[in-house]
């Protein structure tokens, strides 16, 4: 006979891993064409010049160049330029 009652099981105690979202390249950094600039859910930052947007709203460069972030009309934009601006 068991001296003490068996402990109950729990259905808690798990957590999902973080999604590694956010800025991957900063302002003024050099990026090769196709480099990911920003991973996001929704358009927190919009694509500017020479920057494309993926189906999961990831921003990536279309040319080799320097990254520039700007705010225009209450929207944040990420752009890429061949020369540093």
From Swiss-Prot:
One of its GO terms (biological process) is translation. PROSITE patterns: RIBOSOMAL_L27 (PS00831). Keywords: Ribonucleoprotein, Ribosomal protein. Disulfide bonds: none annotated. InterPro entries: Ribosomal_bL27 (IPR001684), Ribosomal_bL27_CS (IPR018261). Residues 1-26 are annotated as: Disordered. SUPFAM superfamilies: Ribosomal L27 protein-like (SSF110324). The keyword Ribosomal protein applies. The keyword Ribonucleoprotein applies. Residues 1-13 have a biased composition (Polar residues). One of its GO terms (cellular component) is cytosolic large ribosomal subunit. GO terms for molecular function: structural constituent of ribosome. Belongs to the bacterial ribosomal protein bL27 family. NCBIfam families: L27. This is Large ribosomal subunit protein bL27. It comes from Mycoplasma mobile (strain ATCC 43663 / 163K / NCTC 11711) (Mesomycoplasma mobile).
């Amino acid at each position: 006979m068991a001296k003490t009652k068996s402990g109950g099981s729990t259905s808690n105690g798990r957590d999902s891993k973080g999604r590694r979202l956010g800025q991957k390249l900063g302002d003024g950094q050099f990026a090769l064409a196709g480099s990911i600039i920003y991973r996001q859910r929704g358009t927190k930052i919009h694509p500017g010049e020479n920057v494309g947007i993926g189906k999961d709203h990831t921003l990536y460069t279309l040319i080799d160049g320097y990254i520039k972030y700007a705010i225009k009309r209450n929207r944040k934009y990420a752009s890429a330029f061949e020369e540093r601006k």
